[in-house]
Design a protein with these regions (language model features):
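Short beta-strand segments enriched for Tyr within beta-sheet-rich domains
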Residues: 73, 123, 135-138, 246
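Hydrophobic beta-strand core residues of beta-sandwich domains
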Residues: 67-68, 115-117, 131, 238-242, ...
Length: 354
C-alpha cells in the first residue's frame, strides 16, 4: 500500500507542516513465518471475518519507531490492513487533532479522544511536539470488545481473531515518535482550513426514496442486495445519471442467520463501504438498536466531516451518504474494503449514464 498526495494552491497557502515535517504513516497487520516471509492463509474463517495478522507494520516496518524534532508535524494515516479496525489514541491521552479525511482538508480542525480508522480510510493529524525534547509520543490502538461470536459459543469471544494472536480490538502499539532537537518554529494551526460546498438534501433526486444497499452474509459469501460480484453485471437499480445528486443508504443487517446454518449464526461484522469515482458526504447514521457497547465505543472516534469515499457501517447500523455523480460517465465499483469480504462477493458495479 502507498499514498498519492494531492495538493493545490489553497492548501499550500495554509502553511501546514511540510517537507520533513510531513509524515505518511501506512498502518498494516501481517503474519510472518520463521524465515520472515509473509504468510497469507485463506480459510473459511478468514473468508468470513477477514484476515488478521499478528504483527503491526508502519510503512512496512515492525516495531516502528521514528526520530522527530520538537516541532509541529502533519501525519497522514492510512489503514492499509485487510480487515483490522484501529481505535487510535496518543498513549498519554492527548487529544488527536484531525485536519483531513479521505477526500481532503476539513473546513476546520476537530479533536477526538480516540479515532476509529477502518480499512481503506485515511485521516490526517496535526501534532505539536514543540517543547518536548527528549520525550516519546506513542500512537497506540486502544482495546475494544470486538464483535459477536458465532452462536456465542463455538469460537468464543475471541473469534474475531480468525486464528490470529491479535484479535480485532486487541491493544496495540502502532508507532513510537522519539522527540529530539528543536525543529522549525511552529506556526499556529489555522482555524479555517477549507471551504466545503455542502450538498443539499432537497436537491437529491431520490430525497424521499434513498437508494438502499443491504449488506449480509449468505452461506460463505458476502452479499449486497442478495447479489455477489459479476465482472460485467450492472443491475437496473445500480444505474445512476451523470450529474445527479443521490442519497445512498448502506444497511448492515449481519447478525441474524443468512441461510448458512451454524457457520453464519449470530455473525456481526462491520463493513467499511467504499465507492469508486466519487467523494461523498455522510448524511446520517441510524445506530443499532439496544445498548451496543461496541458501537458506542467506536462511534466516539468517527470523523464524518468533510469529503469521504469510505464509510464504516457497523453491525445493525444504517448509514446514509449524499453523493453526486459528476465529471465522468462509465462503470465503477462499490464494495466492502474488508478485502476478504470483497473477495467473497461484497463488491458490485454501478453505472453512470450520461
Amino acid at each position: 500500500a502507498g499514498l498519492f498526495i494531492v495538493s493545490d494552491d489553497e492548501e499550500a497557502a495554509l502553511g501546514l507542516p511540510a517537507g520533513e515535517y510531513d509524515l505518511p504513516l501506512i498502518i498494516q497487520d501481517r503474519a510472518f513465518d520463521s524465515q520472515n516471509q509473509i504468510v497469507y492463509s485463506v480459510n473459511e474463517m478468514n473468508q468470513m471475518i477477514g484476515f488478521l495478522g499478528d504483527t503491526i507494520l508502519v510503512n512496512g516496518a515492525p516495531n516502528a519507531a521514528m526520530d522527530v524534532k520538537a516541532s509541529a508535524y502533519r501525519l497522514r494515516l492510512l489503514n492499509g490492513s485487510n480487515s483490522r479496525i484501529y481505535k487510535l489514541a496518543w498513549q498519554d491521552g492527548t487529544p488527536l487533532t484531525v485536519i483531513a479525511t479521505d477526500g481532503g482538508l476539513l473546513e476546520a480542525p476537530v479533536t477526538r479522544e480516540t479515532l476509529t480508522l477502518a480499512p481503506g480510510e485515511r485521516v490526517e493529524l496535526w501534532a505539536d511536539f514543540s517543547g518536548q525534547t527528549g520525550s516519546e509520543m506513542r500512537l497506540v490502538s486502544l482495546p475494544f470488545s470486538g464483535f459477536s461470536s458465532i452462536g456465542g459459543g463455538m469460537m468464543g469471544g475471541g473469534m474475531m481473531g480468525g486464528g490470529s494472536s491479535l484479535p480485532n480490538g486487541a491493544p496495540l502499539d502502532i508507532v513510537s515518535l522519539n522527540i529530539g532537537e528543536k525543529g522549525a518554529d511552529v506556526l499556529p494551526l489555522p482555524t479555517r482550513l477549507s471551504t466545503i460546498e455542502r450538498h443539499r438534501v432537497e436537491e437529491a433526486v431520490n430525497q424521499n426514496n434513498p437508494r438502499s444497499f443491504t449488506l449480509a452474509m449468505q452461506g460463505m459469501v458476502h452479499t449486497i442486495n442478495d447479489r455477489v460480484f459479476e465482472m460485467d453485471a450492472v443491475a437496473q437499480d445500480e444505474i445512476v445519471r451523470l450529474g445527479d445528486l443521490e442519497i445512498w443508504e448502506f444497511a448492515n443487517l449481519e447478525g441474524g442467520g443468512g441461510g448458512g446454518g451454524m457457520m453464519t449464526m449470530d455473525m456481526e461484522m462491520p463493513h467499511p463501504m467504499h465507492i469508486h469515482g466519487v467523494q461523498f458526504q455522510v448524511l446520517s447514521r441510524q445506530p443499532p438498536r439496544g445498548n451496543d457497547s461496541v458501537y458506542q465505543d467506536l462511534s466516539a472516534g468517527f470523523v464524518d466531516d468533510g469529503w469521504k469515499d469510505t464509510v464504516l457501517v457497523m453491525p445493525g447500523e444504517k448509514v446514509q451518504v449524499l453523493v453526486r455523480f459528476e465529471n465522468y460517465a462509465g462503470t465503477f465499483l462499490y464494495h466492502c474494503h474488508n478485502l476478504e469480504h470483497e473477495d467473497a462477493g461484497m463488491m458490485r458495479n454501478y453505472k453512470v449514464q450520461g
